[in-house]
Amino acid sequence: MQITLSNTLANDAWGKNAILSFDSNKAMIHLKNNGKTDRTLVQQAARKLRGQGIKEVELVGEKWDLEFCWAFYQGFYTAKQDYAIEFPHLDDEPQDELLARIECGDFVRGIINEPAQSLTPVKLVERAAEFILNQADIYNEKSAVSFKIISGEELEQQGYHGIWTVGKGSANLPAMLQLDFNPTQDSNAPVLACLVGKGITFDSGGYSIKPSDGMSTMRTDMGGAALLTGALGFAIARGLNQRVKLYLCCAENLVSNNAFKLGDIITYKNGVSAEVLNTDAEGRLVLADGLIEADNQNPGFIIDCATLTGAAKSAVGNDYHSVLSMDDELVKNLFQSAQAENEPFWRLPFEDFHRSQINSSFADIANIGSVPVGAGASTATAFLSYFVKNYKQNWLHIDCSATYRKSGSDLWSVGATGIGVQTLANLMLSRSLK
């Protein structure tokens, strides 16, 4: 079916304020002559077309630009990927941008949607490294990428006790990816950014076990790792020329005779001890290892990204990623990038007093809040702050609840969204110019 864009109103026969009308083998999307609104209308129209069972379309006419093509792709995408879009010819620069967005978006959405039976922690880090290597090979040089994978008991032996503790209960070994994208080829080059992603490939909740309904989508608990990998790959496609390091902290959180238990205490490389009071608050336990490693690189800034708390999702739903940081300038830069890329982020509070709300009688801190009515997203961030020495500057925590939708909407199908890839790539590139 051919799809065209029009600035005229649809005939009343198609309904009041209809955004779609049909003529023979053609569909027409009716715009409102408002940039952001029109992009939304195009995405909504794409969802409607997929909902009608249409799988193959051709976008025709002169009005299709980069942003309209991208909006249509986002709405037309489904997890089964049983569709085909023939895009119009664009000029070289927007054409390359569109293809890079689709390439990185497909990677992120595809890997988040993948079942845990095939995407184990080791497979996740291998796939992430392969993707970045491929991006570097296309847009820079393959030799710009070096990496190592630490898995199984090696994690414990090398002091990555958070990842090891969470993942030791599964037959699928926990793993950590340490990847260095260094286009300068200079081993002494400064690090622009360190990216730290949570990669829990399945989260049963452990002994603090989730109900079935809450567990049904927990193959997606590696959304933070996928998002940061996609963002780095997209930044490379856009010409990133400074050094960035990627740390993915990956495990399965299962119940077994080897699984960690409530009351266990983890002592991290930086000397901080943490008592486990809820095994379903495991994401912060694995991220701590990555943050310590990232902080030791003395980067320009650190971003960690995780599907971390139900509290953030309760606050902003699946429609926004939550941002928590004490660095107002870095937050400002992030929101400038988000606005430029038309992606939704929302700031939640993080203050020093939150750090006193995770007390433990047996360790330095606990992995859940210790006050009767706590701000769950904020106290989770407070936990992470104990693993960043100068936590008030150059560190962003993103609780990425918009990575996945359990139910569809008028904009998105069920499954992963890819929201955030462009914003985080934009932030890296804009900060690299300063």
Swiss-Prot record:
Signal peptide: none annotated. Its EC number is 3.4.11.23. PROSITE patterns: CYTOSOL_AP. The keyword Protease applies. It is found in: Cytoplasm. Its main location: cytoplasm. Mn(2+) 1 binds at residues 203, 280, 282. This is Putative peptidase B. It comes from Haemophilus influenzae (strain ATCC 51907 / DSM 11121 / KW20 / Rd).
